[in-house]
Swiss-Prot record:
CDD domains: TilS_N. Transmembrane segments: none annotated. Its main location: cytoplasm. The gene is tilS. GO terms for biological process: tRNA modification. It comes from the Bacteria. It comes from Prochlorococcus marinus (strain MIT 9313). This is tRNA(Ile)-lysidine synthase. Signal peptide: none annotated. It is found in: Cytoplasm. Keywords: ATP-binding, Cytoplasm, Ligase, Nucleotide-binding, tRNA processing. It holds the Pfam family ATP_bind_3. Ligates lysine onto the cytidine present at position 34 of the AUA codon-specific tRNA(Ile) that contains the anticodon CAU, in an ATP-dependent manner. Cytidine is converted to lysidine, thus changing the amino acid specificity of the tRNA from methionine to isoleucine. The N-terminal region contains the highly conserved SGGXDS motif, predicted to be a P-loop motif involved in ATP binding. Its EC number is 6.3.4.19.
Length: 343
């Protein structure tokens, strides 16, 4: 990947803010790392790219830009071409993919397609330079995105993990975490208002995507209709919601660590000790059962089913079983709770 070069603007408070954040978290974007940056051309990803270009000389990164064309509107190919020309004028390596018709019909499939393509490109960069593998994929998500996600998940119905989603760092592939490619969101401490100012002050171009105004996408409606009302009632609420999501993320991580310790104590050769598990409050039993299923590789269950199992193994309840998806079955005997899997 080529190094970037641009006319250096004066060091700004925005540069200092991200720079100090990275110094305080040296493992987030290590010095001299190979970084693959997802850039749509919108203000958030362009603000991230502009800051990284200027900080590159201090951190020694290798930068490559990836652009995903969802093929949602007629201007998408033009945006891809103009962004490519801008990157090349700044000596930035650039690659892009265009989705096939029907491949990105909604927000979920579009997100899956993007992360799949980013994973493939990161693996390509690593195979081309095995001594300098690409293990970091960056996106321009901000605290505003995090607040939107919290509201959407809350409205749909979710658990603690859903409310604490959009972490600063996670494996990019939830299905294949062993691939060792991390998804990094360096701008979660910045708001959408911040990224607009960054682009303005650094003279960065912005490509407006008509899809961001499409009311068929639930996130757009939250962004354009819900959050403005909440901000007018309680200014700064987006930042507070994002901060709450971060605290919930830490709480969820703590809960997971404690649950793993508890499961180790409850584990026996043929499953979990039913007697000890049954002595716990039903909410604690339900939480431990969820982590036990996840650790065992079983499919996740809706809260209703988890509570059903938890109630069924309470003291005085008879033995029983419950068939799960994909050939899994939970059964509880007098002394144990067991998990079986048949292809």
């Amino acid at each position: 990947m080529a190094s970037s070069s641009s006319t250096q603007l004066p060091w700004s408070a925005w540069h200092a803010r991200l720079h100090h954040k990275l110094l305080a978290n040296p493992d987030l974007l290590p010095a001299k790392a190979s970084l693959l940056i997802a850039v749509s051309g919108g203000q958030d990803s362009m603000a991230l790219l502009g800051l990284l270009i200027d900080l590159q000389r201090k951190h020694g990164w290798s930068l490559e830009v990836w652009h995903g064309d969802h093929n949602w509107h007629k201007q998408s190919a033009t945006i891809a071409t103009e962004l490519k020309n801008w990157c090349e004028s700044h000596n930035l390596s650039f690659c892009s993919d265009q989705a096939k018709p029907g491949q990105t019909n909604n927000e979920a499939t579009a997100r899956h397609w993007r992360y799949e393509q980013l994973t493939l490109h990161a693996e390509r960069l690593s195979s081309n330079n095995p001594n300098h593998p690409c293990r970091y994929v960056l996106t321009g998500h901000t605290s505003s995105d995090r607040a939107e996600t919290l509201l959407l998940n809350l409205a749909r119905g979710t658990d603690l993990a859903g409310l604490s989603s959009m972490r600063q760092c996670r494996p990019i592939s939830k299905d294949h975490p062993h691939k060792n490619v991390q998804l990094i969101r360096p701008l979660l401490g910045f708001s959408r208002e911040d990224t607009a100012l960054i682009c303005s002050e650094l003279g960065l171009p912005i490509w407006l995507d008509p899809a961001n105004s499409n009311p068929d996408f639930s996130r757009n409606r939250v962004r354009q209709e819900v959050l403005p009302v909440l901000e007018s009632l309680h200014p700064g609420c987006s930042l507070r919601m994002a901060a709450l999501a971060e605290r919930l993320n830490h709480h969820h991580a703590d809960q997971q660590a404690i649950a793993m310790l508890a499961l180790n104590n409850l584990s026996k050769q043929n499953g979990l000790c039913r007697k000890d598990l049954a002595q716990l409050p039903i909410t604690a039993r339900t939480t431990l059962l969820a982590y036990w299923l996840k650790r065992s590789g079983a499919p996740s269950l809706p809260a209703v089913q988890l509570e059903q199992i938890s109630q069924s193994i309470a003291p005085g309840k008879p033995p029983g079983s419950l068939h799960l998806a994909q050939g899994w079955k939970v059964q509880w005997q007098r002394n144990s709770v067991q998990l079986e899997h048949h292809d």
